Amino acid sequence: MKKFIFTITFFFIPLAYLLAEVDILAQPADERATCNTFSIVAFDPETNEWGIAVASKYLAVGSAVSWAKAGVGAVATQASVNVLLGNAALELMGKGKNAKETLDELIKADAGREIRQIGVVDKNGMTANYTGAKCNPWAGAKAGKNYTCQGNLLTGPEVLDSMAKGFEETKGSLGFRLLFSLAEGEKAGGDKRGKQSAALLVVKPNGGPNSLGDRWLDFRVDDHPNPIDELIRVANLTSRFKAVLKVK
């Protein structure tokens, strides 16, 4: 009975209070989950799909960074990652806030904002991104129509430039374009520490198995010497990928 009461009480804690209490700056540096990474979040208005592709020298990066819900939007939360921001962003967008309004509210409420990095795309393809002043350099973001790329601890801005160009100039399914963008980012330098994991998540209405749920593509490579190549190989095993991207 006590457990039930606690659960209900916790559910109604205001978002601002909950996020403000998570002050990661007060934690020792070696206890922080730090997803130094590069990612792209995007929307395809023709297929009504939202997706994220991410890679990092971090174990199982997809488990922390990637968040999406069909008809709502997609979110990448990274750097000194606060996983609460993923669901919180989807909840705010589900209530009608656009990408910028959502991001502004989250950042205002988060005590660890200086070491966060977030990319958001909403149900209409509007994007917003934020890079905290204390994210590990090189850190920044680059946005275009229906997408935003962001990264930290990168070899330089050319990583995001290559990702953006790859996404804009490539035709095919959203999953294909996301992975192509990710591969171009790695080719340009990627995470300056190296590589370990990568993930691809694409959602669409009734996109899950037997038209249940929204997970159209959901692939992760959690620990591999060439995670993007392996992610491409796995994605090509399904007909849902719709376009073959060759492992380089």
Which residues does each PLM region occupy?
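Bacterial N-terminal signal peptides
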Residues: 7-20
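Positively charged n-region of N-terminal signal peptides that target proteins for export
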Residues: 1-4
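N-terminal nucleophile
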Residues: 22-248
